[in-house]
Amino acid sequence: VQANTVVLPGGADAAVVRLRPQQGAGAMAKATRAVAAVVDCPNRWVALDPERGGMAAVAEAARNLSCVGAEPLAITDNLNFPSPETPTGYWQLAMACRGLATACKGLDTPVTGGNVSLYNETRLPDGRMQPIHPTPVVGMVGLVHDLAHVTGLAWQEAGDAIWLLGAPLAAGADERVTLAGTSYLECIHGQLTGRPPVIDLALERSVQAFLRQAISQGLVASAHDLSDGGLAVAAAECCMASGLGAHLELPAGDGRLDHLLFAEGGARILVSVPPAQTVAWQQALDQASSAGHDVPAQCLGVVAAGADLSMSQAGIPLVELPIDQLRTTFEQAIPRRMGADLPPTA
């Protein structure tokens, strides 16, 4: 309330709140800086591998802050776990904390506080009690140094190039990007299985630092991380947020299409770059490479003036979905679960 909100939750990967001008010695003459905040927990990953899941929670929170141009500073954790008096519960808590600690050290985001809730159970439909999945929720704050450079997730202009930062789309095996523990497996196949992706903290650091620098230089029009649902869902969210369409050309190969579309992990971020910034963008990538920083980047497509999300591979159409259909499906998700229907959004 009265906190000078710059970006509301949902408009970007993190909420942004302006820091008001202060009085006295050393005070800011005007509001030029802001605090960004985000909360994350890849609950499926934690259930399958608490250590990797704990690392992923911190990495995703930092990535979300970087997507708005904020420098990650610190976290607070909210640890919700079953009984630690059982071998499984004790192991889950210990390994999740180890993962949180490893990622916090690797990304320079200290833990400033938190809380713990143990002995949590849920009642099944048949009346039996079952331990909850381990749920280490990470809240992270970051600093926006210049309010003139805050980036949302929505495409901005037709003709902007769409780039993927982070582990590239490829048919080959990459432990950093997998289908294990994904939304796709759970929603489409009803499976919660596999070992989640390896968390590459060095890649996270380099990609996030590069993105923040590019945003500060005005090279990036939008940025959105690939998390739940992978590439296909991230692209759909950017389309729904903007009303602009997009065309993506997936790399050819013998790999599984569902892996290309829905795999998760890999410190990946989808960004759009205006044509006027193409040369400067490529120079920034070249400079990062020359400096020894690992910042993989692929140009996947272009923002379109039409109201459709399309994807193809080797010129063969794979996906062609109207944005209105995507938005209706998204907005009807809760009513569908509740057995009710809402009128379509105007």
Task: Give residue spans per PLM region.
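Glycine-rich phosphate/pyrophosphate-binding loop regions near the starts of catalytic domains
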Residues: 1-170, 182-188, 193, 261
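Glycine-/charge-enriched secondary-structure boundary and capping motifs
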Residues: 96-103, 107-112, 116-136, 193, ...
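Long hydrophobic segments that form regular secondary structure
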Residues: 1-15, 20-33, 54, 154-242, ...
